[in-house]
């Protein structure tokens, strides 16, 4: 049996895909795997901020089409890039174990954390979620737009005379670049994007043979977290255009879910947390979304 795995062509996307293949090979040594690189709209447009060029799905639509057309058997994505609803005929397989969900600071030599940075320090990020949460901690920071893959963004610190950048810890860890990390941003300082650090394995809805194989990678706790966080995402109808975040913490048989929702200018930002039962994570996410949206509509600053 040969399984064709579709992915974006960035170094990080390939590392993530190879990780999935290696995990599957441990369980199914008799199966051969082949990687197929697919260019997406998000890969082709590098000089414009994500919130200006489209909605969620920017990095997945072309890959999904090849899955529907039967040209690939599995698609591997970063879960945080996935739209709320998948194309007809496609579904998620169970979710593998999540990498560290936090964001990290990668700073110029001489600086270690947010408090070290001088007044007016220039920090690069492509995310409004990160921008407005950092400005809440340090209103003096000059947050600038930065796009590109992990290596490109790190290079831009020097090339564009920035003090540093903010990236997802998961990408840095998977790319084996941990030595570049200056400090981790705690989840109560910068709430991560929903499902940050988790991988999405997408398959055809009617492909039970492939589903049986990839579901062997299921991680129970990750799946609970992702259902809660993406429940919040769906409930607020989140997109690239607005700052939005969610993080689910599992405490024994309970879950603690925090959500953030704001306007595109960062003038109205609501953060709220609720606790619920581990057996209904998606419902808790949807419930928190309703509470946050209600507070957002009545926002007085």
From Swiss-Prot:
Pfam families per UniProt: Porphobil_deam, Porphobil_deamC
EC class name: transferase
Cofactor binding, per record: Binds 1 dipyrromethane group covalently.
InterPro entries named among the record's database cross-references: HemC, Porphobilin_deaminase_cofac_BS, Porphobilin_deaminase_N, Porphobilinogen_deaminase_C, Porphobilinogen_deaminase_C_sf
EC number(s) on file: 2.5.1.61
Biological processes annotated in GO: protoporphyrinogen IX biosynthetic process
Top-level taxonomic group: Bacteria
Pathway: Porphyrin-containing compound metabolism; protoporphyrin-IX biosynthesis; coproporphyrinogen-III from 5-aminolevulinate: step 2/4
Signal peptide (UniProt feature, chain positions): none
Cofactor(s) required, per the database record: dipyrromethane
Cellular component, GO annotation: cytoplasm
Annotated PROSITE patterns: PORPHOBILINOGEN_DEAM
Subunit structure: Monomer.
Miscellaneous note of the record: The porphobilinogen subunits are added to the dipyrromethane group.
Function recorded in the entry: Tetrapolymerization of the monopyrrole PBG into the hydroxymethylbilane pre-uroporphyrinogen in several discrete steps.
Classification via PANTHER family: PORPHOBILINOGEN DEAMINASE (PTHR11557:SF0)
Protein name: Porphobilinogen deaminase
Organism ancestry: Bacteria, Bacillati, Bacillota, Clostridia, Peptostreptococcales
């Amino acid at each position: 049996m040969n399984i064709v795995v579709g992915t974006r062509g960035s170094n990080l996307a390939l590392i993530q895909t190879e990780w999935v293949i290696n995990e599957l090979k441990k369980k199914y040594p008799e199966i051969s795997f082949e990687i197929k690189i697919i260019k997406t709209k998000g890969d082709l447009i590098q000089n414009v901020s994500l919130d200006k060029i489209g909605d969620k799905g920017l990095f997945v639509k072309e890959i999904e089409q090849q899955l529907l057309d039967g040209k690939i058997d599995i698609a591997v994505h970063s879960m945080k890039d996935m739209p709320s609803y998948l194309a007809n005929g496609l579904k998620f397989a169970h979710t593998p174990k999540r990498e560290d969900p936090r964001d990290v600071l990668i700073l110029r030599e001489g600086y270690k954390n947010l408090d070290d940075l001088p007044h007016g320090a220039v920090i690069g990020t492509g995310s409004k979620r990160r921008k407005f949460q950092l400005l809440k901690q340090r209103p003096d920071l000059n947050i600038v737009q930065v796009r590109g893959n992990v290596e490109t963004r790190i290079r831009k610190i020097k090339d564009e005379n920035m003090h540093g950048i903010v990236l997802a810890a998961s990408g840095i860890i998977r790319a084996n670049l941990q030595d570049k990390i200056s400090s981790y941003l705690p989840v109560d300082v910068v709430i991560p994007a929903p499902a940050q650090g988790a991988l999405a394995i997408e398959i055809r809805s009617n492909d039970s043979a492939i589903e049986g194989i990839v579901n062997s990678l299921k991680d129970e706790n990750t799946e609970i977290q992702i259902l809660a966080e993406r429940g919040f995402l769906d409930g607020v109808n989140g997109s690239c255009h607005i700052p939005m975040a969610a993080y689910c913490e599992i405490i024994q048989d309970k879950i603690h879910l925090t959500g953030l929702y704001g306007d595109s200018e960062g003038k109205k930002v609501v953060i709220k947390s609720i606790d619920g039962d581990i057996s209904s994570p998606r419902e808790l996410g949807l419930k928190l979304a309703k509470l946050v949206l209600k507070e957002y509509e009545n926002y007085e600053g």
